[in-house]
Amino acid sequence: MLTLDTLNVMLAVSEEGLIEEMIIALLASPQLAVFFEKFPRLKAAITDDVPRWREALRSRLKDARVPPELTEEVMCYQQSQLLSTPQFIVQLPQILDLLHRLNSPWAEQARQLVDANSTITSALHTLFLQRWRLSLIVQATTLNQQLLEEEREQLLSEVQERMTLSGQLEPILADNNTAAGRLWDMSAGQLKRGDYQFIVKYGEFLNEQPELKRLAEQLGRSREAKSIPRNDAQMETFRTMVREPATVPEQVDGLQQSDDILRLLPPELAKLGITELEYEFYRRLVEKQLLTYRLHGESWREKVFERPVVHKDYDEQPRGPFIVCVDTSGSMGGFNEQCAKAFCLALMRIALAENRRCYIMLFSTEIVRYELSGPQGIEQAIRFLSQQFRGGTDLASCFRAIMERLQSREWFDADAVVISDFIAQRLPDDVTSKVKELQRVHQHRFHAVAMSAHGKPGIMRIFDHIWRFDTGMRSRLLRRWRR
């Protein structure tokens, strides 16, 4: 069967112009105009999708099949082009009957053209074929437009669904244009309204806990750029004025204990003339406990020193992925569970904004994994947020899973984050030594987010940084009172 792409080539119909008109009409639709005004960050992300839309439309037109009636009419037209005028005159009745049988738009006009001329000349033959070709071009263009209209409706429906999802999640997850673009890419999955309400719910909870949000931001910024001295910098002499105590004091400021013989009080000096107190005088002299005058004074002098002319290099510290381990034991239920999930959502927001990866592992009796920054990040986040925290605590397995992932090439610069109340058994010696090796040799950093003030110090001592967020009732009331 004839394809629409072949028909367009045969009739020299340009589908590119039709595709561009359709895309312009789609972008100018009132729904998108309102959305762009409300969420300007997502405008660029949607605009970046236009090449993909264009390619999808080309593919749709290329693979579309031409209706059998139109295919038969096109074949008849091609055969008629090969006929001479005498042959065309002989075949004309069959051609007219075929057009009538196919309900061709050209059928009625063709018969009128033939009836209006008693003799079929070469010029009439050419005119007949030209008008027939125009009729076929109109039919092909109409077919293209119908298919594009169907695609436009389908595409608009898809875009509206993604706009609804992205519009709901943009205030929660999109901190800049980069995050907005990644959020738009992740919104392509098949999600229902009830699904992403989990993210909205924990986003609202995070806004109610600004201290928790700030804690996540501090952890995300913890690998800041720093300056380091240059070894090859040239030295230059600098002079500056410094203030120091004067050699000749200006006034008496009080009394003090010291060994300053020149400023002894008369009663202390009198002890030297008493034999019984002489040794006591020397003892207090050695111990600097003689009462003396305290004199006060200061002066300025010039200090000369050398320092490098350009003494610092800017050492940009890379910000790698997050590997987050979340304790899902029974003691982490309730408010602790809400805080842990909201904290992971805050890290996901940071990862999207800074083009980093965010990998979540839940540990209790088994380990469950989610990647919140991948193409299916929203679906993964929903699955994570819908998990219930019930089980035991196996912190050693958590560390082993982290260390296994850190040894892979794509996670070599990752930061490991463990969220727990750290009420657990001590870590085995082999785990502790392996963690210290990763910290020392590979510069991996381990962060602890402590949800309790009663975590075991022996466990927490292994971490580079400890971020405390006490979820006890007293701390919660204090935070609420401060707000």
Swiss-Prot record:
Domain of life: Bacteria
CDD domains, per database record: VWA_YIEM_type
Chief subcellular location: cytoplasm
Keyword Cytoplasm: yes
Pfam families per UniProt: VWA_CoxE (PF05762)
One annotated Gene Ontology cellular component of this protein: cytosol
InterPro entries reported in the protein's UniProt record: Uncharacterised_CoxE, Uncharacterised_ViaA, VWF_A, vWFA_dom_sf
Job description of the protein: Component of the RavA-ViaA chaperone complex, which may act on the membrane to optimize the function of some of the respiratory chains. ViaA stimulates the ATPase activity of RavA.
Protein name: Regulatory protein ViaA
Organism: Shigella flexneri
Lineage, highest ranks first: Bacteria, Pseudomonadati, Pseudomonadota, Gammaproteobacteria, Enterobacterales
Gene designation: viaA
